[in-house]
Regions:
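N-terminal secretory targeting modules
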Residues: 1-97, 106, 111
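Conserved SGNH/GDSL esterase-like catalytic core that processes O-acyl groups on lipids
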Residues: 88-177
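Active-site segments of SGNH/GDSL-like serine hydrolases
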Residues: 161, 165, 186-218
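Generic structural signal for well-ordered alpha-helices
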Residues: 178-182, 224
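Loop/turn elements at helix/coil->beta-strand transitions in domains of secreted/extracellular proteins
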Residues: 95-97, 154-158, 189-194, 234-237
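Catalytic His-Asp segment of secreted/periplasmic serine-dependent ester chemistry enzymes
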Residues: 202-283
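Second-shell loop/turn segments in exported
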Residues: 132-137, 164-173, 185, 210-217, ...
Length: 283
C-alpha cells in the first residue's frame, strides 16, 4: 500500500486547526517499524514496492490519564466478543499498554505522533500472507517478526489492521490467514484484549487511477463482513473503524485521502476518537 501524506489540516483533539501539511515526495524503499518502548524505536529500510509517509511535526496529544469506566464498573467481560458497540469513553492512557499491528496505514500512528504512548509494530508492504514469517520489525538491536516483537512488549491490548494489500485475493483464504494471526497474537500476548479492525473504504475514483481499477468498496465490505464473523468465532472484538470514513456512497471522501486509500493526518485523530468510544475497560 502506498502511503502519501497529502495536504491536510492537523487538528488537536479539541478540533482546533493548528497546522497544514505540505505534500511530500516519498522514498519507496523505506519500511518503518516503530515502538514506544525505549528499546524499540527505529526505522528499518528493507526492499518494498510501496512508499510510506514521511514524518511530520508531532500533533498535540491529549493529556494522558487513567481510563474512564462506566458507573457500573464495566469489565472485560461486559461486552460479548464480536462487533463492539459504542462504550463509555476512555482516555489516552488506555493505549499505554496497547500494541498496533499492521501495514503502511498503521505506521502513520507513529509518524504523525497521533498517540505517542502506544506501541506500533508495522511495516510498509506487510500483509496477511507474510505477517507471521517476515522479519520486518526493528526491535532494539534485533530485526524480528511481528509476533516475536509482540512477545517482548507485555501488551494488554492488541489492535490489528491488515488486508488492504490483498483485498482482491480469495477472501476465504484471507480470513483463514487472519484466523492464524489471531491465534498467534493470543499465544504471544495471552493476557491481552484483541481488537480486529475493519479494512478502510477507498475513494474509488482516485484509487482506480492510481492503483487498480478492479477494486471497489463492495470487495472491502464483503471481506469486512467475513472478518466480523471470524472475530465472533475467535472470541475477539471487531471494530468497524471504516464507518468513520464512509460517506453516503459507502466510499471515502476525497478530502480524507491523498491517494484514494491512505488517510490524511487529521483522519488519524478521527480514528483514535472512534477507538476511545469502542474500548473494553480492562479489569
Amino acid at each position: 500500500a502506498v502511503f502519501s501524506a497529502a495536504a491536510a489540516g492537523i487538528w488537536q483533539l479539541n478540533s482546533t486547526p493548528v497546522q497544514a501539511l505540505k505534500p511530500l515526495e516519498l522514498d519507496p524503499s523505506v519500511v518503518a517499524a516503530f515502538s514506544s518502548s525505549p528499546q524499540a524505536v527505529a526505522i528499518q529500510a528493507i526492499p518494498s514496492s510501496e512508499p510510506e509517509p514521511s514524518s511530520q511535526e508531532p500533533l498535540p496529544e491529549e493529556a494522558s490519564s487513567e481510563p474512564a469506566q462506566s458507573a457500573s464498573g464495566q469489565s472485560e467481560s461486559a461486552q460479548t466478543p464480536g462487533a463492539l458497540e459504542e462504550q463509555p469513553r476512555v482516555t489516552s492512557a488506555y493505549f499505554d499498554d496497547a500494541v498496533f499491528i499492521g501495514d503502511s496505514i498503521t505506521t502513520g500512528i507513529k509518524l504523525y505522533d497521533v498517540m505517542s504512548n502506544t506501541t506500533v509494530l508495522a511495516s510498509t508492504g506487510i500483509g496477511l500472507e507474510n505477517i507471521l514469517s517476515k522479519p520486518a520489525i526493528k526491535y532494539g538491536e534485533e530485526t524480528l517478526t511481528a509476533m516475536q516483537a509482540l512477545a517482548k512488549t507485555g501488551a494488554r491490548k492488541v489492535y490489528i489492521m491488515l488486508g488492504a494489500n490483498s483485498i482482491l485475493g480469495d477472501h476465504d483464504t484471507m480470513v483463514g490467514l487472519y484466523g492464524n494471526l489471531i491465534d498467534e497474537v493470543r499465544r504471544n500476548a495471552p493476557d491481552s484484549i484483541i481488537y480486529v479492525q475493519s479494512v478502510l473504504p477507498i475513494n474509488e475514483e482516485i484509487f482506480h487511477v492510481k492503483y487498480n481499477p478492479n477494486t471497489d468498496n463492495s470487495d472491502i465490505m464483503d471481506f469486512n463482513t467475513k472478518l466480523a464473523a471470524l472475530a465472533a468465532e475467535k472470541q475477539v472484538y471487531y471494530l468497524d473503524v471504516g464507518s468513520v470514513f464512509r460517506d453516503e456512497t459507502g466510499g471515502m471522501p476525497a478530502d480524507y485521502t491523498p491517494d484514494g486509500m491512505h488517510i490524511n493526518s487529521a483522519q488519524y485523530i478521527m480514528w483514535f476518537d472512534y477507538l476511545k468510544t469502542h474500548a473494553i475497560a480492562a479489569e
